[in-house]
Design a protein with these regions (language model features):
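Short hydrophobic/Thr-rich beta-strand motif most characteristic of the beta2 strand and flanking loop
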Residues: 33-40, 48
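Receiver (REC) domain active-site loop signature in two-component systems and cognate sites
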Residues: 63
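Charged docking surfaces used in two-component/phosphorelay signaling
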Residues: 23-31
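Active-site beta3 strand of CheY-like receiver
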Residues: 52-58
């Protein structure tokens, strides 16, 4: 049975080591009505996801401890989190990076810099398609 959630109360976990990015995204999404939690360490990301139980994850690829691909795999290996959509946020835009992000379980790929409005559109689209609104 597919769970239905309201977009306005969806929980978003932002995993990025750049405070200027996380601050902007957290503020914008909170003002849009989302419940937002931030994790700056990729090593702690899977544990934070298990604790927070997000409806969607925003994940940077270039992180210092583990890259976003490894982090995505760690999250997807958890049975409780396996179906949570992951949107990669990255400064990388090579075709092989995009392909690899999908191969490890990512659902979308957004290149930095991005507009908050576009990010919101993509989050809404992913939530609607995942949770069958």
């Amino acid at each position: 049975m597919t769970q239905k959630i309201k977009i306005q109360t969806a929980k978003v976990l932002v995993i990025d080591d750049e405070p200027e990015i996380t601050d902007i995204v957290e503020t914008f999404l909170t003002e849009a009505g989302y419940l937002v939690n931030v994790e700056n360490s990729s090593r702690n990301a899977a544990a934070k996801a298990r604790q927070f139980k997000p409806d969607v994850v925003l994940l940077d690829i270039m992180m210092p401890d583990m890259d976003g691909y490894q982090t995505c795999q760690a999250i997807k290996q958890d049975p409780e989190l396996a179906n949570v959509p992951i949107i990669f946020l990255t400064g990388k835009d090579r075709t092989d990076d995009m392909g690899r992000s999908f191969k490890v379980g990512g659902d979308m790929f957004i290149k930095k810099p991005f507009s908050c409005e576009r990010l919101l559109e993509i989050i809404n689209l992913v939530i609607m398609s995942t949770y069958k609104h």
